């Protein structure tokens, strides 16, 4: 509330981050591994706090992926990754539609006040039922589609994507250390 009061209803521009040297190397290595060498699977190993979620965002952008699945082991990591991706998408003026496949409806609530002012209208859907997810996936859009899910909800997204005859351009699977 303090941020909103100081802003007097005016949203401050969100800053688009630039990759740091280690992130630039990771992006370059991903391009070489997946695009140049045409590998279908790979690993990006980076320490905690080094910006893996942000690097994943930049890799997806570099690949020009339009249908992205981001799978993580916990609800907390969905929320953290969603905040990073949503913030940078707004900062870079990207047209994105979002859905979270998990059991916690509060995951879509962006908690960072600086970001929440501009992201409150993103309309982030939270679903667990494959039929609802499939219906959402079937809606065609020119926007980039990003699906966040926990591994625990993986079966729901697998069932939904099969039902919707929907395939992803890029899958990012994160681990917690």
Label for each model-derived stretch:
Residues 48-51, 76:
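ATP-binding Walker
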Residues 62-63, 138-142, 162-166:
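Conserved catalytic network of the ASCE P-loop NTPase/AAA+ motor domain
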Residues 67, 142-146, 167-170:
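Loop/turn-to-beta-strand initiation segments
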Residues 127-139:
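Conserved helicase ATPase core of P-loop NTP-dependent helicases/translocases
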Residues 140-159:
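Conserved two-lobed SF2 helicase motor
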Residues 151-153, 163-177:
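SF2 helicase catalytic motif II
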């Amino acid at each position: 509330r303090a941020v909103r009061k100081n802003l007097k209803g005016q949203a401050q521009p969100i800053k688009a981050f630039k990759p740091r040297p280690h992130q630039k190397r990771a992006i370059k290595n991903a391009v070489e591994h997946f695009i140049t060498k045409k590998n279908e699977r790979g690993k990006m190993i980076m320490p905690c706090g080094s910006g893996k979620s942000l690097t994943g965002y930049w890799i997806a952008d570099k690949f020009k992926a339009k249908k992205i699945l981001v799978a993580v082991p916990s609800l907390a990591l969905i929320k953290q990754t969603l905040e990073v991706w949503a913030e940078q998408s707004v900062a870079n003026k990207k047209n994105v539609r979002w859905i979270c496949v998990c059991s916690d409806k509060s995951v879509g609530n962006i908690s960072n006040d600086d970001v929440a002012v501009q992201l409150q209208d993103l309309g982030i859907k939270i679903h667990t039922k494959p039929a609802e997810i499939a219906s959402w996936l079937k809606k065609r859009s020119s926007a980039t589609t990003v699906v966040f899910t926990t591994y625990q909800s993986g079966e729901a997204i697998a069932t939904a994507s099969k039902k919707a005859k929907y395939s992803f351009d890029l899958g990012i699977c994160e681990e917690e250390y």
